[in-house]
Amino acid sequence: MRWLLALICLSFATLSCASTVEIIGGKPVEKILVLKSARQLQLINDGKPLKTYRISLGKNPKGAKLIEGDRRTPEGFYWIDWRKTSDRFNLSMHISYPNISDSARARREGVSPGSMIMIHGTPDTEEYPEQWFHTLDWTDGCIGMRNVDMREVWNLVKDGTMVEIRP
């Protein structure tokens, strides 16, 4: 009888850890496409946008990220490799920047490419309410979104999803 109870508990624990990623219209998100010039993040399936969100970029938005501290958002192909909750930015999903070519370029130039590029929500304090951030580029190179949009993307995108960031 104890082994049956243990089996039931183990089954419950396994199922509770299963992915809870949602789908849009019966289609999973295959890729995140960021269009920097349009300030858009699109969730893509079969090459077509399923949903589009407005985003904010680094304070120096033109051009690809070159060195640590340049406040630019990178351009290229990356992956969502981990995620976390944050007191400062609510939900955050890490982008695998720098990729191999970013690292090689930085090594050739003798500089640090930077790191910790995230897709994240916005701070929401009395001093700086969330709507203050939505219309300007305010990050240090990350991709900022309204918290309600970030919660939705968090639930729709699984770790390992490709991220393409275009100029």
Language model features by range: what are they?
Residues 21, 82-167:
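Exported/periplasmic cell-wall-interacting domains
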Residues 48-60:
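Short Gly/aromatic-enriched secondary-structure transition segments
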Residues 31, 52-54, 77, 116, ...:
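Well-ordered beta-strand positions in beta-sheet-rich domains
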Residues 1-4:
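Positively charged n-region of N-terminal signal peptides that target proteins for export
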Residues 19-30, 37, 57-82, 100-105, ...:
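N-terminal post-signal-peptidase region of extra-cytosolic proteins
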Residues 13-16:
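N-terminal signal peptide c-region/cleavage motif recognized by signal peptidases
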